[in-house]
Each structure stands twice: as C-alpha cells, then as structure tokens.
Amino acid sequence: LECHNQQSSQPPTTKTCPGETNCYKKRWRDHRGSITERGCGCPSVKKGIEINCCTTDKCNN
C-alpha cells in the first residue's frame, strides 16, 4: 500500500507501507490553526481529533 505522508499543506509525498491495509488522514486545531497529518495505518485518536482511514493507494491526500 502507498500512503501520503506530508504534513498539512506541504507538497504531496508518499511512502510505501509494507503489510499495511490502511492509510489515514488526521485533522485537529491548535494555536497555529488547522493541522493535518497523514500516514500508514489507522491509529486510534483522542476526542476532538478527526480521522479518516481508507484502503487504496494514495487515498489519504
């Protein structure tokens, strides 16, 4: 599986995730504004963090 791994509005980058079946995109707000984190897997998140998990190559941009 290939997942995007750039932060927030950085130019898109991807990484290969051997053995993974999910990519994720996580969003939250802090004093700097809205933060977006992308990567492999489907981590559990704390309340107040929005997460989208998906199962196809580069689906988490």
Swiss-Prot record:
List the Pfam families hit by this protein, alphabetically: Toxin_cobra-type
Q: Which UniProt keywords apply?
A: Acetylcholine receptor inhibiting toxin, Disulfide bond, Ion channel impairing toxin, Neurotoxin, Postsynaptic neurotoxin, Secreted, Toxin
Q: Any keyword Coiled coil?
A: no
Family designation: Belongs to the three-finger toxin family. Short-chain subfamily. Type I alpha-neurotoxin sub-subfamily.
Functionally, this protein is described as follows:
Binds to muscle nicotinic acetylcholine receptor (nAChR) and inhibit acetylcholine from binding to the receptor, thereby impairing neuromuscular transmission. Produces peripheral paralysis by blocking neuromuscular transmission at the postsynaptic site. Binds to the muscular nicotinic acetylcholine receptor.
What tissues express this gene product? Expressed by the venom gland.
Q: Is Secreted there in the keyword field?
A: yes
Q: What is this protein called?
A: Short neurotoxin 1
- Where is this chain's protein located in or outside the cell? Secreted
Gene Ontology MF terms in the entry: acetylcholine receptor inhibitor activity; ion channel regulator activity; toxin activity
Q: Please, which domain of life does this record's source organism belong to?
A: Eukaryota
GO CC terms of this entry: extracellular region
